[in-house]
Amino acid sequence: MNNYTYNVIVQLEGDSVTAGAAANAFSKHPSDTMVIQYSLTTRKYHVLHGDVTRAQSGKVRWITVGHGDYFGANNPTVYAYKSASEYTEGLNYLKQKVFNNHNPDKLVMLGCELSRGGINENFALKAVVLLGESHTNVPVVAYKREINVANNGQKRIYPTGKYGDSVTTEGYKMIYTYHSETGQVEINNRFAALHFINELRRGELTFAQLIQSSKIDPLRMF
C-alpha cells in the first residue's frame, strides 16, 4: 500500500540499467508518480511524466535512482559517481528550483550498497546528516547490498553479488533518521553507535572501519 499522496522518481543516470530501474519503480504507482531525469553535474532536469504541482504539497516520497559504488577499505562510497555532499547539494537545488522548497516526507535511495561499510564508507549516514543540517530533515532509506527493481516494482537484494540468488529486502533495508537537536542519527530505530557496534560483532565491519572517519566525528554518535 502506498501511504503517500505523490511519488517523485529522480533518475540520476542515463544508462539502460538506471532507466530500467526507474521504469520498474514507476510501474508500481503510475497514476501517483512523476519521473524526472536530473543531472547532479549540470543541474539540468527534464520531467518525463507527471505533475510537478502535485509534488509541491502533501505527503511526498522521493526515490532517487542511480548506481552505488562501494569500495571498502575506508574509501567513501559514491552514488551516481557523486559524493554524499554533491548528492545532497544537488537534491537541495532540485527542491528549491522545481518543488517550491517542499520537503519530501521520505527519501529512498535506490542504489547498490549505499548503507554498507563503516562511518567513512557509509553513504546514507553522511547523506542524512548533510540533508538534516541543510534543513531537509527527512528519513532516508538505503540498502546494504546490491539491489534490483523487478518488473512489478518489487525490490530484490543480492547478498553475494548480482550473479547470486536474490532475497527480499528484510535485513538489508536501513532507515536513517537525523535528530537536529543532538546531531545524532538513528538507524532502524537504534542509535547509529549501537548499529555499527552490532555490525562489528556480526563481522560486517572491522574495528578500523568503525573508528576511522574524515568527515563525521564517530564519538558524536555516542
What would you call each of these model-derived segments?
Residues 2, 6-118, 204, 209, ...:
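Catalytic-core segments of thiol-dependent peptidases
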